[in-house]
Regions:
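Hydrophobic, well-ordered secondary-structure elements that form the walls
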Residues: 56, 81, 130, 155, ...
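Cytochrome P450 I-helix active-site segment
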Residues: 4-62, 82-85
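Active-site-adjacent bridging/hinge elements
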Residues: 27-30, 139-151
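Cytochrome P450 heme-binding "Cys pocket" and the immediately downstream C-terminal segment
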Residues: 5-8, 162-200
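C-terminal helix/juxtamembrane-tail motif
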Residues: 200-219
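Eukaryotic short linear interaction motifs
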Residues: 83-84, 90, 95-98, 158, ...
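Conserved cytochrome P450 K-helix/beta-meander segment immediately N-terminal to the heme-binding cysteine loop
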Residues: 89-140
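C-terminal, well-structured subdomains that either form a transmembrane helix-short loop-helix hairpin
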Residues: 75-80, 86, 148-176
Length: 219
């Protein structure tokens, strides 16, 4: 958030607008300014909040690889995969954070071609950049299928805690963004170094917060 002040400011504006009564921006509101409750946060749709969360997860590549075992003999893009083979799917390389590799479409199965029509692909010009707007449709609605994202795996063996993660992120990001401004850090503290194991975690997590005191703005 601190590294992307424009996205942070837009998110705060849209959260304040969405929770206008709670934050005291409604002229006829009888209550004093306060942070929204958990129920209010979960019941209020803020497409740009969803976009920020999804883009943060995409760029964080928390789980760099997903493993699957072939239960039957099969073929992947023309390559024979015997039953019992462990297949590792990288979720932080081409198509995710790098431009997609060229693939002969005739090698894809009908199911793969159909799935490709459902999911979008990322613009190779900015696939490595933090661009929350990539998750929004032209009408401003959130599009969870805008492009590939596999931080939680996929299919019936995907992460069973996925829904809880999104709920927690929606609550925490909303409250922190409404209450505080994330200020820029010195270069020595503003790093993206990670500790790598089966998942990735930040080596350090420094923040510089400033309370938000000016709640009045024009959308």
């Amino acid at each position: 958030m601190a590294s992307h002040p424009e996205s942070q400011s837009r998110l705060r504006r849209e959260l304040q607008a969405a929770h206008a009564v709670a934050v005291g921006r409604e002229k006829d509101a009888s209550s004093t300014r306060r942070l929204p409750t958990v129920d209010e946060i979960l019941d209020t749709r803020v497409p740009f909040l969803d976009a920020i969360i999804e883009e943060t997860i995409r760029c964080s590549h928390i789980v760099p690889v997903t493993a699957r075992e072939a239960l039957v003999d099969t073929n992947i893009l023309g390559h024979h995969i015997p039953k019992g083979t462990h297949v590792y799917l990288l979720s932080n390389g081409p198509s995710f954070l790098l431009p997609a590799l060229a693939v002969d479409e005739s090698l894809r199965t009908d199911a793969a071609r159909a799935a490709r029509d459902i999911h979008g692909v990322w613009d190779p010009a900015n696939v490595a950049d933090f661009v929350p707007e990539r998750w929004l449709r032209p009408d401003g609605a959130f599009d969870p299928l805008a492009g590939p994202q596999m931080a939680f795996g996929g299919g019936p063996r995907g992460c069973f805690g996925r829904k809880m993660v999104y709920l927690e992120l929606r609550i925490v990001v909303t409250i922190l963004t409404l209450a505080f401004e994330f200020c820029d850090l010195d270069d020595a503290l503003n790093t993206f170094n990670t500790r790598e194991s089966s998942t990735e975690a930040p080596q350090d997590c420094y923040v510089k917060l400033r309370p938000v005191v000016d709640w009045d703005f024009d959308l």
